[in-house]
Amino acid sequence: MPRWIFAFILPCLLLSLGVLIQAQAAERELVILTTFSREPLLPLVEEFSRRYQGIEVQIIHRRAQSSVQLLNKSYIQNIDLVLSSSPYLMQNLAQSGKLAALPEPMQTPEWLKPYALPMTEHVATIGYSGAGLVWNQDYLKTHQLPEPKQFSDLAKPVYFGHVTMSTPARSGTTQMMVESILAKYGWQKGWEILLRVGANLATASARSFGVSDYIANGQFAVGPTIDSYALILGRKLDYVQFVYDESFTLMPTYVAQIRQNHNDQYAKAFIELLMSNAVQTNMEGNDFAKHSVQDQSLVNERFTRLPMGSIIRREECLNDLFDLAITKHLPQLKDTLLAVLEAKEQFARRPSVLAKIEQIERTVFTMPISEQEVDALAIQIAPNSALSEEQQAESAMLLAEKGHEWQMRLEKQLEQANQELKILLAEEAQ
C-alpha cells in the first residue's frame, strides 16, 4: 500500500476506533440526575455496583427547574435516569415526551395515588416520605422554648429568631409543604401562617437537607423537613427530635428512565433494583430513609391531599411569590415584626392603642396578591415544549413583569404598615 494512502487511512481508523471506544464506554456507564443530595443515594449505588461490576455510576445533583433546563438542551444525551420527589420535574419530562414507558408492575400503587402524579405510566414510585418538624431538644431547653406540634406553631412570637427552613425555589419538598399549608388553611390564612413563620426565621437555608444540619449543630431550634433527613440524624443524635405534621402532604419518590435511541439495560436494571424486595424491605433502614411502597403504616386520610395539576402548573409563580414576600424581604419582615412585638408589649395595658397595633400587624401578614392572579399567570406562562424560543422568552418576560408588579405591591404594603406604626407611636409619645 502506498505510504500516502496509509497516512490518509490511519487517522480515519483511529477516529473510528475512538468513537467506538467512547460508545462502548457510554454503554458501561449509568448517569443519574437527581434532586436529592448525593450521600443518601450511595448505599443504592454501592448495591448496584456490587451486582453489575464494571459499570460506572455518576450522580448529577440539580434542583427541579435546573433539571428541566438541563434536559431541554439538545446536546445532553448521556443522562439515563431521573430520581426525584418533584412532581413538577417528572410531569414536565413526561409531557415533553422525554421519558420511556415503564411496565405496569413499576407504576404507583393504588393506595398512594391520591398523593402522587396524575400521570404515572412513565414514572415509577419507589417510596415516599412524610414531613414534619425537626428540633434540637437541648436548644429548646436552653432557650426555654416549648416543643412544637405542627408547622403553624412556628408562627408564634416565642419562636422569633429560632426557626430555619428552605425555600420552595430551592427545594421541591419545601414547595410541597408550602402548597400543603395553602391547601389546608386556604390562601389568605395559609399565607398569614407562612408570612409569620417567615418573620420568625433566623435564616433561610439554601438546601432542604441544610435545615436538619443547622438544627443538629445547635445553630437554630426548629424547622420543617421531610422525615428522611431528620430520621437519619436522629439515629446518631438523641437530642434531635422529629414529629410528623399531617398539615403536610405525603411525598412520593419517583424514578423515570430517559427515552434513548438505544436500549439502556442498566437504567432498567437500576429501576428493578429499587423496586426489588431486597431494597424495599430495607429502604427505611439505610441512608436513603424512605418508606417503602410495600409499607402503608404512615398513610391515613388526615394528611393533606393536593390538587396536583394546579400546583405543578403554578410552581414557578408560587416560588417567585414566596421569594418576593419572604426570602428577599427577610430583614425588613423581621424588623417589622420585632417593632410590632415591642409596641404590643409597651401598650399591653392600653386596649385602644393595642387594637390599632394589632390592625397594623394584620396588614403586615396579609398577602395582597390573590390566588386567582397567581393561577391566571400560571396558565399564561405554562411550560410547553411546542413553544418557540421567542414564545418562551415572552413567557419569561411576562413572569418578570408580573413579579416586579407583585414586588411593588408587597413593598408598599410593608412600608405603609411601618409608617402607620411610627405615626401611632409618635402620637402616643406626646
Regions found by a protein language model. Name each.
Residues D295-A348, M397-L398, K402-Q416:
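An extracytoplasmic/periplasmic, membrane-proximal ligand-sensing/linker region
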Residues Y88-N92, A216, A221-Y239:
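A ligand-binding cleft/hinge motif common to bilobed small-molecule-binding domains
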Residues E345-Q430:
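C-terminal non-catalytic accessory extensions
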Residues I193, H262-L274, N282-G285:
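Short amphipathic alpha-helical coupling segments at ligand-binding clamshell hinges
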Residues V163-S166, L273-D295:
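Periplasmic-binding protein-like
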Residues A26-Q91, V364:
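Early extracytoplasmic/lumenal segment of secretory-pathway proteins
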Residues V134-Y139, M251-D264, N282-M283:
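A bilobed periplasmic-binding-protein/Venus flytrap-type ligand-binding module shared by bacterial periplasmic
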Residues L42, N78-I79, S85-S205, F209-A216:
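Extracytoplasmic ligand-binding site segments that recognize negatively charged/polar headgroups
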